[in-house]
């Protein structure tokens, strides 16, 4: 294991946030990192939740407008259905990339017994894309590119790593990489220099940014400063698993009211009114209830 970064300007950790458990939805437990008061958002990212849900809890019918949600199952299965008649179940290792655009009403509920776990990321849309038609990309685990070398394995949900590239279309340019490092291994991942980036530790502990940095355990979100890429070392005796997420900043005002994310307060008021009255993208919401 080398003790130095391959980057002349490695990205260092500039902020560390512990994602504490809280209640959300209907009886669900989430660990929120981005979206907490101390890390309100990290352009273009609005929220990251690590969720843990057992039946009958879940996320019953609720609306969205103005952003994308990316749901990545770590354990178990979730069934999603919406007011446009779309219904699907994602299982361990699967991803659902949902563009809410001008409006969606949907439910997300556990699809089986036991505890269902996953990550949900909210990605902002630029003003020109906020009112587009909703769309979905569902990625099955076996179809998601993966690579492995020198004790490091990666699943490439978006972006590229270790010579492999994801085919997922991201309206806001995004990378989303799921890494596992065996004990004693290291990895150096380039990140576009103009992008904001952070990582979330799912299990184990690692040294991030510089080899002499203090190791950080699971359920922490680490915001990375500017530079060419991230260097990480697993000096422990157990595997380290973390997701590395980066994106091109949108650099527009963010006004959020619950499940609506727009650029101005008046647009938020309009979204709330559209949802209440069932118009401008929410036409089907008044007659629809999930089964």
From Swiss-Prot:
The keyword RNA-binding does not apply. SUPFAM superfamilies: RmlC-like cupins (SSF51182). Belongs to the pirin family. It is found in: Nucleus. GO terms for cellular component: nucleus. This is Pirin-like protein. CDD domains: cupin_pirin_C, cupin_pirin_N. It comes from Solanum lycopersicum (Tomato).
